[in-house]
Design a protein with these regions (language model features):
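Nucleotide-activated donor-binding/catalytic signature segment of Leloir-type glycosyltransferases, i.e.
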Residues: 1-25
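Short hydrophobic beta-strand element within catalytic cores of glycosyltransferases
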Residues: 33-36, 56-68
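Short acidic active-site motifs
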Residues: 22-23, 53, 92, 96
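Short alpha-helical segment that forms part of, or immediately flanks, the ligand-binding pocket
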Residues: 25, 47-60, 75-76
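Hydrophobic "lid"/C-terminal helical patch
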Residues: 4, 97-101, 131, 135
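Acidic donor-binding loop of glycosyltransferase active sites
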Residues: 28-47
Length: 141
């Protein structure tokens, strides 16, 4: 909140206290653009941090903006699922926001055409099936 008040953007933002997990899909569906905060790590630093927030965001079909791109797994997943943009520059983020803002002005909502099959691979149901296959295979050894 402090960072938002340092710039003239606070009036465009909603801040939530604790939100129960059961309410998260509703919050995401009421949002216009979903924000995923990340960063580019040093070449010897950690890579591939993908939180459940990412997968929940991809599932609702709203534009997903990741700032700053991790230039790794997160960026590749967003690109491969067509769920938004992992911005490497402020200009990229600006163009993404402007595009979806103009769509919102014209239509009253935002949407992005994700690759639903690619997103579905990350669902809890699909992951549970994958784990069951692994455990079944291990059990047969």
């Amino acid at each position: 909140m402090q960072a938002a008040t340092a710039y003239p953007v606070a009036r465009y933002m909603d801040f939530f206290d604790y939100v129960p997990a059961s309410e998260i899909p509703g919050v995401l569906n009421r949002s216009s653009i979903l924000l995923q905060l990340a960063n580019t790590f040093a070449s010897d630093g950690p890579k591939g941090f993908m939180t459940t927030k990412l997968f929940e965001s991809m599932a609702v079909g709203k534009p997903l903006l990741c700032v700053k791109s991790d230039e790794s797994c997160l960026e590749a997943t967003i690109r491969n699922t067509h769920s938004g943009l992992a911005a490497r520059t402020a200009e990229e983020a600006f163009r993404f926001i402007l595009h979806h803002y103009q769509f919102w002005q014209d239509n009253g909502y935002t949407h992005i055409n994700t690759d639903k099959e690619a997103v579905e691979r990350f669902s809890r149901k699909k992951q549970a099936v994958q784990f069951m296959r692994i455990f079944t295979r291990l059990n047969s050894k």
